[in-house]
Amino acid sequence: MAVTKEEVVEFISNMTVLELSEFIKELEEKFGVSAAAPAAAMMVAAPAAGGAADAAEEKTEFDVILKEAGANKIGVIKVVRALTSLGLKEAKEKVDGCPSTLKEAVSKEEAEDAKKQLTEAGAVVEVK
């Protein structure tokens, strides 16, 4: 009598957290594997490989945050519309609601370009 996958899943789903934890430990020992997520394993291995490399690692994604609109509010709204493809009302709400995030997870070049355009229009911008 063979056990089906569905029966195994049903059995595991009825286990308590403690039972499941012990079950996973037994499987890890029996098969010589780890149930840790690959990303977590890489984070643990990276500092061991070279702590100095982490400090030198450059951030690849940036957020563009509008801190203040400045005196030329209309000019800033125009730039916000061009950068974000928002409508006039939405762009005005972003500018009026400072501080507000205009772009998230963009490249360094795109973030610097947006900052330059907004600063030229009179806005105060922060890139994180």
Swiss-Prot record:
Organism domain of life: Bacteria
Gene Ontology annotations for the cellular component aspect, listed alphabetically: cytosolic large ribosomal subunit
GO biological process: translation
Molecular function terms, GO-annotated: mRNA binding; structural constituent of ribosome
Stretches that traverse the bilayer: none
Protein keywords: Ribonucleoprotein, Ribosomal protein
Pfam families, A to Z: Ribosomal_L12 (PF00542), Ribosomal_L12_N (PF16320)
Function noted in UniProt: Forms part of the ribosomal stalk which helps the ribosome interact with GTP-bound translation factors. Is thus essential for accurate translation.
Subunit comment: Homodimer. Part of the ribosomal stalk of the 50S ribosomal subunit. Forms a multimeric L10(L12)X complex, where L10 forms an elongated spine to which 2 to 4 L12 dimers bind in a sequential fashion. Binds GTP-bound translation factors.
Family, per entry: Belongs to the bacterial ribosomal protein bL12 family.
Protein name, UniProt field: Large ribosomal subunit protein bL12
Source organism of this protein record: Desulfovibrio desulfuricans (strain ATCC 27774 / DSM 6949 / MB)
